[in-house]
């Protein structure tokens, strides 16, 4: 793991993250103009960072947040489509991989169902290698249709890459799912705003440590008339230490080199902090000392996860019993979100 240079090598993958200024757009033409701006930035960054293998832009960087529902549906993208064609040309020209946001991607039943919040991983030939749809939209505000699966793809120089989006990262389950599928780099693209800066910086570092995985965070910056975005795009080592982190500045860039050998060696030879291995080899020292299996215990000891798989509806009822039974709350009602007071009128 190297930081401070502009190079990369056969062993290291050069990764850049961008504090892209949150755009405020209203039409398809404006979206395509902004996509060309992103494409120009990709090509320009490669000149300044010749080792850059992968460039990552934040959630909402292509379309911004469409606070008007009509505009959101009208500007929703097809994948592949006009926006991805612009990005593909830039990736081919710069000979670089990219992660780009599409908010939203048209649902299969568009316009009868809400769009998806989507990321794509594109290779240096302009081909879409991974398309990820946000599993945990930021309710109650975000109205995206939820995705249902994480992916791992072979990325630049063979590094294994997973994509997640913003609020996804507040749930440890998604990080573990990606890591246990073999991800060596988890990319978290976000359009996160104040006041949650401290918490979001913290959790990405903690999840890198807990999952023995590189993390690259690209976050929006600036003010879009509604929210103020805190930036702090960062690249984090698999030991949870930050390699490079932006401040709040618009269009800030951080860059680091991620060693394939180091993470694979750590996962192979690490012992006391090899969290992936230890999770499914519980207590092997005590079992060896007891004359039992040297591989420890593999079975899941966590009742919540067992129950969730076996009985999802019953598990939801259990959670509602200790939280609430409706999506909204009476004490802070949000238009369009049912709360207990509204439910009692039916």
Swiss-Prot record:
Catalytic EC class: hydrolase
GO molecular function: amidase activity; hydrolase activity, acting on carbon-nitrogen (but not peptide) bonds, in linear amides
Entry's EC annotation: 3.5.1.4
UniProt KW keywords: Hydrolase
Catalytic activity: a monocarboxylic acid amide + H2O = a monocarboxylate + NH4(+)
SUPFAM superfamilies for the chain: Carbon-nitrogen hydrolase
CN hydrolase domain mapped to chain residues: 13-260
Domain of life, source organism: Bacteria
Catalytic residues (positions): 59 (proton acceptor), 134 (proton donor), 166 (nucleophile)
One Pfam family per UniProt: CN_hydrolase
UniProt xrefs under InterPro entries: Aliph_Amidase/BUP, Aliphatic_amidase, C-N_Hydrolase, C-N_Hydrolase_sf
NCBIfam families: PRK13286.1 (NF009802)
Matches recorded under HAMAP family: Aliphatic_amidase (MF_01242)
General function of this protein: Catalyzes the hydrolysis of short-chain aliphatic amides to their corresponding organic acids with release of ammonia. Also exhibits in vitro acyl transferase activity, transferring the acyl moiety of short-chain amides to hydroxylamine to form hydroxamates.
Family per similarity comment: Belongs to the carbon-nitrogen hydrolase superfamily. Aliphatic amidase family.
PANTHER family: ALIPHATIC AMIDASE (PTHR43674:SF14), NITRILASE C965.09-RELATED (PTHR43674)
Name this polypeptide is given: Aliphatic amidase
Species annotation: Bradyrhizobium diazoefficiens (strain JCM 10833 / BCRC 13528 / IAM 13628 / NBRC 14792 / USDA 110)
Gene: amiE
């Amino acid at each position: 793991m190297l930081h401070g240079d502009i190079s990369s090598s056969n062993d290291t993958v050069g990764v850049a993250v961008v504090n892209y200024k949150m755009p405020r757009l209203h039409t398809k033409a404006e979206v395509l103009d902004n996509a060309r701006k992103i494409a120009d930035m990709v090509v320009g960054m490669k000149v300044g960072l010749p080792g850059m293998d992968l460039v990552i832009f934040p959630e909402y960087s292509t379309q911004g947040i469409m606070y008007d529902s009509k505009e959101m549906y009208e500007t929703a993208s097809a994948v592949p489509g006009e926006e991805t064609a612009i990005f593909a040309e830039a990736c081919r020209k710069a000979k670089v991989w990219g992660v780009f946001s599409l908010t939203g991607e048209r649902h299969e039943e568009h316009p009868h169902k809400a769009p998806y919040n989507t990321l794509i991983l594109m290779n240096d030939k302009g081909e879409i290698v991974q398309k990820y749809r946000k599993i945990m939209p930021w309710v109650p505000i975000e109205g995206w249709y939820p995705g249902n699966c994480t992916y791992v793809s072979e990325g630049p120089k063979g590094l294994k890459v997973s994509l997640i989006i913003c609020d996804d990262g507040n749930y440890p389950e998604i990080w573990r799912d990606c890591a246990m599928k073999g991800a060596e780099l988890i990319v978290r693209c976000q359009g996160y705003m104040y006041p949650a800066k401290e918490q979001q910086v913290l959790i990405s570092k903690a999840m890198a440590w807990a999952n023995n995985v590189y993390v690259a965070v690209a976050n929006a910056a600036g003010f879009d008339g509604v929210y103020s975005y805190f930036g702090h795009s960062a690249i984090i080592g698999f030991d949870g230490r930050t390699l490079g982190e932006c401040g709040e500045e618009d269009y800030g860039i951080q860059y680091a080199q991620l060693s394939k050998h180091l993470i694979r060696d750590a996962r192979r030879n690490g012992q006391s902090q090899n969290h992936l291995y230890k999770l499914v080899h519980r207590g092997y020292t005590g079992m060896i000392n007891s004359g039992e299996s040297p591989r420890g215990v593999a079975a899941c000891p966590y009742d919540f996860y067992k129950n969730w798989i076996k009985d999802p509806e019953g598990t939801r009822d259990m959670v509602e019993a200790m939280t609430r039974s409706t999506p909204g709350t009476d004490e802070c009602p949000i238009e369009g979100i049912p709360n207990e007071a509204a439910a009692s009128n039916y």
